[in-house]
């Protein structure tokens, strides 16, 4: 808890009768476990009457146009669905309250009901495929939705106006230990040349953070009688779509075409620097992002970290990155190598559980810190993410969505 209090995100149903409170919008996948989704739902007792309060968590893979669902075609696959009866609490759903839930119930009163979900670690991270200008419907990709509503049973049809829907994100952060420094080399023998051309390339490290420049060291030994006319460096994003059949889509996210030449019987060495940015790739249809294009906190999708023995069929979209170094050789074709690397966000620093106490000040009793200190120090914030300027302000962003590239047409 910092000096500014504990931030809690809230969202109300369109009819104003239900409000969901969550401590965060992004939940971290630590490879072996995932942060639990814990929160409370506040319900108007006059609206609830004799009904029950349900909360569901759904992980869905959307891969086509929703408006075609009326034709009997399904363009969505639910990878995971969990239901909790928040009130009255079902015995199998009853779990110990988290610290956040205790504080929220104390602040909001007796009509605030807790819910907790455990996300299995083998589920995919949140990824959106960037839409094209002609695309309509929800964005294609993997998303997680928390939905709260009142009903007599789970099968009852619920109008959107009477429910709260929140799209949360499952994210991964860069591992603390990077892999080995990426290096690659190849040798090409040409006709009419006694000696070969040798290309060697390396990156300065294996893990890069979003927005960080990538240094590519290129070394060419040209013992042939041919000339290297150009050197092309590109950073490519690969998205493996794992659903029924695995398909791979690749998209360049940073490129440099240098007019550097390497004459026959000579050597060449140079470091090239490229920085992949979403801002330079906003028009590319099918590019994998970690959020929606209209949100400020969206960037290129992070590399996917896989558990050993993970079932690829339910991993949705697996994202990876490679640097490609290509030599254009006169009358000899191209010579190329690829360097895989990891692109992610660094793991944020964890906030201390307790405030620092100056040496000349008597520390507060431990029990008071745990039970009473700052119980009212909660800052409520709307769940909706900050939009980029000029982006259309949807009234119900989870309902209307952005356009989606359709995988069946690609």
UniProtKB/Swiss-Prot annotation:
Residues with Phosphotyrosine modification: 47
Residue stretches of biased makeup (Polar residues): 401-410
Compartment(s) where it occurs, according to its Swiss-Prot or TrEMBL record: Cytoplasm; Nucleus; Cell membrane; Membrane, Clathrin-coated pit
Keyword list, A-Z: Cell membrane, Cell projection, Coated pit, Cytoplasm, Cytoplasmic vesicle, Membrane, Nucleus, Phosphoprotein, Protein transport, Signal transduction inhibitor, Transcription, Transcription regulation, Transport, Ubl conjugation
GO molecular function: G protein-coupled receptor binding
Pfam family, one: Arrestin_C
Motif [DE]-X(1,2)-F-X-X-[FL]-X-X-X-R motif, residue numbers: 385-395
Region (Interaction with TRAF6): 318-410
Chain sites annotated for binding 1D-myo-inositol hexakisphosphate: 250, 255, 324, 326
InterPro entries tied to this protein: Arrestin (IPR000698), Arrestin-like_C (IPR014752), Arrestin-like_N (IPR011021), Arrestin_C-like (IPR011022), Arrestin_CS (IPR017864), Arrestin_N (IPR014753), Ig_E-set (IPR014756)
GO biological process, one term: positive regulation of receptor internalization
Chain spans, region Interaction with SRC: 1-163
Subunit structure: Monomer. Homodimer. Homooligomer; the self-association is mediated by InsP6-binding. Heterooligomer with ARRB2; the association is mediated by InsP6-binding. Interacts with ADRB2 (phosphorylated). Interacts with CHRM2 (phosphorylated). Interacts with LHCGR. Interacts with CYTH2 and CASR. Interacts with AP2B1 (dephosphorylated); phosphorylation of AP2B1 disrupts the interaction. Interacts (dephosphorylated at Ser-404) with CLTC. Interacts with CCR2 and GRK2. Interacts with CRR5. Interacts with PTAFR (phosphorylated on serine residues). Interacts with CLTC and MAP2K3. Interacts with CREB1.
The protein's name in its UniProt record: Beta-arrestin-1
Organism name: Macaca fascicularis (Crab-eating macaque)
């Amino acid at each position: 808890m910092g000096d500014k209090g504990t931030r809690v995100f809230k969202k109300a149903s369109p009819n104003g009768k239900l409000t969901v409170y969550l401590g965060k919008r992004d939940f971290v996948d630590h490879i072996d476990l995932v942060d639990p989704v814990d929160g409370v739902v506040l319900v108007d007792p006059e609206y609830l009457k004799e009904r029950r309060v349900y909360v569901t968590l759904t992980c869905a893979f959307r891969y086509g146009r929703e408006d075609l669902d009326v034709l009997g075609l399904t363009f969505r696959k639910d990878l995971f669905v969990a239901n909790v009866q928040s009130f009255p609490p079902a015995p199998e759903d009853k779990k110990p309250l988290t610290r956040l839930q205790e504080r929220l119930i104390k602040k909001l009163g007796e009509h605030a009901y807790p819910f907790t979900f455990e996300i299995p670690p083998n589920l995919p991270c949140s990824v959106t495929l960037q839409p094209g200008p002609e695309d309509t419907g929800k964005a294609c990709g993997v998303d997680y939705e928390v939905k709260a509503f009142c009903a007599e049973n789970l099968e009852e049809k619920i109008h959107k106006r009477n429910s709260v829907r929140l799209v949360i994100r499952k994210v991964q952060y860069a591992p603390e230990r990077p892999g080995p420094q990426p290096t690659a080399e190849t040798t090409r023998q040409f006709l009419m040349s006694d000696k070969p051309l040798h290309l060697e390339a390396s990156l300065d490290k294996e893990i890069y953070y979003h927005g960080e420049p990538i240094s590519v060291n290129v070394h060419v030994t040209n013992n042939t009688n041919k000339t290297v006319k150009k050197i092309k460096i590109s950073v490519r994003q690969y998205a493996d779509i794992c659903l029924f059949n695995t398909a791979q889509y690749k998209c360049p996210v940073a490129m440099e075409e240098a007019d550097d030449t390497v004459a026959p019987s000579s050597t060449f060495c140079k470091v090239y620097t490229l920085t992949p940015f979403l801002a330079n790739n906003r028009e590319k249809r099918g590019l994998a992002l970690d959020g929606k294009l209209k949100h400020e906190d969206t960037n290129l999708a992070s590399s996917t970290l896989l558990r050993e023995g993970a079932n690829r069929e339910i991993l949705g979209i697996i994202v990876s990155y490679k640097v490609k170094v290509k030599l254009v050789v006169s009358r000899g074709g191209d010579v190329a190598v690829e360097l895989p690397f990891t692109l992610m966000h660094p793991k944020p620093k964890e906030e201390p559980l307790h405030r620092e106490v100056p040496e000349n000040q008597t520390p507060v009793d431990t029990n008071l810190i745990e039970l009473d200190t700052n119980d009212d120090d909660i800052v409520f914030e709307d769940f909706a993410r900050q939009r980029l300027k000029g982006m259309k302000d949807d009234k119900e962003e989870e309902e209307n969505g952005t356009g989606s590239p359709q995988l069946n047409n690609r």
